[in-house]
């Protein structure tokens, strides 16, 4: 990260000191900078109470997004913040009004503020369980939009479901569709017992590849944080680009690169970052980037030197990180979105994220619903052909 401090630019305003809220009651429409100034404790206590916590709904992710997204998007973002009678924050909903192509027709949509930048998964509205969400619906009704789209929702997202129920009570129409498959592992407490769940061929391959590397090379796994954070990040990006031969990859978009540089710094400060390389004879051959949140280890991205493909260095490093998660007492290992073949080799379990589209009542909403229904029908007919 080229010597970048923990927070620069917009993120410099994301301090850990919270804004005094004791005099506020009800729903307040805030800028993203003011909402982030409430501090990580306010955001993350809601994340922790929202079923399985999602790192992508956290203060850290939103702060990194705000320092990476187009300036106009950040300026246009509104965060609906519900304050209880004692001034404590009961709910947070960061949204952005933008023009999108809905079924090829340009419309004004309300979406998650963070959009799909950086591929966030398992999202949900942030609220305490006892907070009624009708007040947020009233605030949403005051904003000008034609469709409200909540993408990348966690399966059975509790608060999004409650929000949709409140919207339906006002006559708004809610439609759902599956989105992304996210493979995951439910971890036990023993590495060998996990290996026993794999095919015998898979087990033998894993053991043989690691044994050969240790026999033929000085093999080590290096973890990066603190003073070595820049070094580790640069090695990850370099190996990721080599894997794609300079023609693609997750970090080709400068905004995505900047977002993760900011997020990685915050994760490292919280001791939640897993940034590692597998080194052979003193040189990095593969890299792994993920993070912990609650009882889950999330795998985000990796890279490898193609010269070591025959030795399966990526396979060996992934096995080491899964084993570390098991031995560290974590309960779940989440591969995040995408049914890549290498993910299916580790697990058959997957969660499906969801997209919810909400239509207002009236002729405009009816027309957009009809447009949506026709597009869905065409898709089903094409699938049968």
At which residue positions do the language-model features occur?
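Hydrophobic pocket-lining residues that define ligand/cofactor binding sites across diverse proteins
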Residues: 140, 267, 325
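A conserved beta-strand-loop-helix scaffold within acyl/acetyltransferase catalytic domains
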Residues: 26-112, 152-182, 186-310
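A short, internal acetyl-CoA/4′-phosphopantetheine-binding micro-motif in the GNAT/acyltransferase core
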Residues: 117-131, 302-310
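Hydrophobic, well-ordered secondary-structure elements that form the walls
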Residues: 282, 314, 321, 325, ...
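Conserved acetyl-CoA-binding loop-helix of GNAT-fold acetyltransferases
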Residues: 129-140, 310-322
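Structural motif
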Residues: 127-130, 150-155
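Active-site/acyl-donor-binding loops of N-acyltransferases
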Residues: 2-19, 23-25, 29, 97, ...
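Conserved GNAT acetyl-CoA-binding A-motif
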Residues: 145-153, 325-337
